[in-house]
Amino acid sequence: MRQVARVIVFLTLSTLSLAKTTQPISMDSYEGQEVNITCSHNNIATNDYITWYQQFPSQGPRFIIQGYKTKVTNEVASLFIPADRKSSTLSLPRVSLSDTAVYYCLVGD
Protein backbone atom coordinates (compact mmCIF):
# COMPACT_ATOMS: atom_id res chain seq x y z
CA MET A 1 0.00 0.00 0.00
CA ARG A 2 1.33 3.43 -0.93
CA GLN A 3 1.43 6.10 1.74
CA VAL A 4 0.30 9.64 1.04
CA ALA A 5 2.59 12.47 2.06
CA ARG A 6 0.97 15.85 2.58
CA VAL A 7 3.01 18.90 1.76
CA ILE A 8 1.50 22.03 3.28
CA VAL A 9 2.47 25.37 1.86
CA PHE A 10 1.31 28.68 3.31
CA LEU A 11 0.99 32.07 1.69
CA THR A 12 3.74 34.24 3.09
CA LEU A 13 4.57 37.90 2.84
CA SER A 14 8.30 38.38 2.95
CA THR A 15 9.58 40.78 5.55
CA LEU A 16 12.91 40.90 3.73
CA SER A 17 11.68 43.02 0.83
CA LEU A 18 8.54 44.52 -0.67
CA ALA A 19 7.97 41.50 -2.93
CA LYS A 20 4.78 39.64 -2.11
CA THR A 21 4.98 35.87 -2.52
CA THR A 22 2.04 33.59 -3.34
CA GLN A 23 2.03 29.81 -2.96
CA PRO A 24 -0.56 27.01 -3.06
CA ILE A 25 -2.26 26.20 0.26
CA SER A 26 -1.55 22.45 0.29
CA MET A 27 -0.80 19.51 -1.94
CA ASP A 28 -0.78 15.72 -1.63
CA SER A 29 1.63 13.22 -3.11
CA TYR A 30 2.43 9.53 -2.88
CA GLU A 31 5.70 8.44 -1.31
CA GLY A 32 8.47 8.19 -3.87
CA GLN A 33 6.99 10.81 -6.20
CA GLU A 34 8.54 14.15 -7.07
CA VAL A 35 6.74 17.20 -5.69
CA ASN A 36 6.99 20.63 -7.35
CA ILE A 37 5.85 23.70 -5.42
CA THR A 38 5.58 26.98 -7.32
CA CYS A 39 5.86 30.39 -5.72
CA SER A 40 4.89 33.61 -7.52
CA HIS A 41 6.79 36.81 -6.77
CA ASN A 42 5.78 39.26 -9.49
CA ASN A 43 7.42 42.40 -8.09
CA ILE A 44 10.81 40.90 -7.20
CA ALA A 45 13.70 43.39 -7.09
CA THR A 46 16.76 42.96 -9.30
CA ASN A 47 19.08 42.07 -6.42
CA ASP A 48 16.65 39.79 -4.50
CA TYR A 49 17.41 36.14 -3.83
CA ILE A 50 14.73 33.45 -3.57
CA THR A 51 14.98 31.27 -0.47
CA TRP A 52 12.93 28.22 0.53
CA TYR A 53 12.45 26.95 4.08
CA GLN A 54 10.81 23.86 5.56
CA GLN A 55 9.13 23.89 8.97
CA PHE A 56 8.03 20.89 11.01
CA PRO A 57 5.47 21.19 13.84
CA SER A 58 6.93 22.70 17.03
CA GLN A 59 10.22 23.54 15.29
CA GLY A 60 11.71 26.63 13.71
CA PRO A 61 12.09 27.02 9.92
CA ARG A 62 14.96 25.06 8.34
CA PHE A 63 16.80 26.37 5.27
CA ILE A 64 16.38 24.20 2.15
CA ILE A 65 17.81 26.09 -0.81
CA GLN A 66 18.50 29.59 -2.18
CA GLY A 67 18.99 30.91 -5.68
CA TYR A 68 19.20 34.01 -7.83
CA LYS A 69 18.60 32.71 -11.35
CA THR A 70 18.38 29.56 -13.50
CA LYS A 71 18.70 26.26 -11.59
CA VAL A 72 20.24 25.43 -8.22
CA THR A 73 20.50 21.88 -6.87
CA ASN A 74 21.66 20.48 -3.55
CA GLU A 75 21.29 17.14 -1.74
CA VAL A 76 17.76 18.04 -0.56
CA ALA A 77 16.05 19.80 -3.48
CA SER A 78 16.28 21.68 -6.75
CA LEU A 79 15.21 25.27 -7.37
CA PHE A 80 14.15 26.39 -10.84
CA ILE A 81 13.99 30.12 -11.60
CA PRO A 82 12.90 31.32 -15.07
CA ALA A 83 14.63 34.26 -16.76
CA ASP A 84 11.95 36.80 -15.72
CA ARG A 85 12.30 35.68 -12.03
CA LYS A 86 8.58 36.29 -11.44
CA SER A 87 8.18 32.77 -10.05
CA SER A 88 10.23 29.88 -8.75
CA THR A 89 9.65 26.15 -8.37
CA LEU A 90 10.97 24.04 -5.53
CA SER A 91 11.39 20.42 -6.60
CA LEU A 92 11.53 17.72 -3.92
CA PRO A 93 12.55 14.36 -5.41
CA ARG A 94 11.12 11.13 -3.98
CA VAL A 95 9.10 12.54 -1.08
CA SER A 96 8.29 10.46 1.97
CA LEU A 97 6.05 10.93 5.00
CA SER A 98 8.99 12.59 6.75
CA ASP A 99 8.72 15.45 4.21
CA THR A 100 5.30 16.44 5.57
CA ALA A 101 5.88 20.05 6.62
CA VAL A 102 5.14 23.69 5.89
CA TYR A 103 7.26 25.11 3.05
CA TYR A 104 7.98 28.84 2.82
CA CYS A 105 9.21 30.86 -0.13
CA LEU A 106 10.86 34.16 0.80
CA VAL A 107 12.29 36.88 -1.41
CA GLY A 108 14.95 39.32 -0.25
CA ASP A 109 18.55 40.43 -0.56
Swiss-Prot record:
Signal peptide: 1-19
Domain of life (superkingdom): Eukaryota
Coiled coil: none
Subcellular location: Cell membrane
Glycosylation site residues: N36
Database matches in Gene3D superfamilies: Immunoglobulins (2.60.40.10)
Start and end residues of each Ig-like domain: 20-109
Record's keyword terms, sorted: Adaptive immunity, Cell membrane, Disulfide bond, Glycoprotein, Immunity, Immunoglobulin domain, Membrane, Receptor, Signal, T cell receptor
Chief site of localization: membrane
One Gene Ontology CC term in the entry: T cell receptor complex
S-S bonds: C39-C105
Gene Ontology process terms (BP): adaptive immune response; response to bacterium
Subunit structure: Alpha-beta TR is a heterodimer composed of an alpha and beta chain; disulfide-linked. The alpha-beta TR is associated with the transmembrane signaling CD3 coreceptor proteins to form the TR-CD3 (TcR or TCR). The assembly of alpha-beta TR heterodimers with CD3 occurs in the endoplasmic reticulum where a single alpha-beta TR heterodimer associates with one CD3D-CD3E heterodimer, one CD3G-CD3E heterodimer and one CD247 homodimer forming a stable octameric structure. CD3D-CD3E and CD3G-CD3E heterodimers preferentially associate with TR alpha and TR beta chains, respectively.
PANTHER family assigned to the protein according to its UniProt record, in alphabetical order: T CELL RECEPTOR ALPHA VARIABLE 4, T-CELL RECEPTOR ALPHA CHAIN V REGION-RELATED
Stated role: V region of the variable domain of T cell receptor (TR) alpha chain that participates in the antigen recognition. Alpha-beta T cell receptors are antigen specific receptors which are essential to the immune response and are present on the cell surface of T lymphocytes. Recognize peptide-major histocompatibility (MH) (pMH) complexes that are displayed by antigen presenting cells (APC), a prerequisite for efficient T cell adaptive immunity against pathogens.
Name assigned to this protein: T cell receptor alpha variable 4
Lineage, top ranks: Eukaryota, Metazoa, Chordata, Craniata, Vertebrata
Gene designation: TRAV4
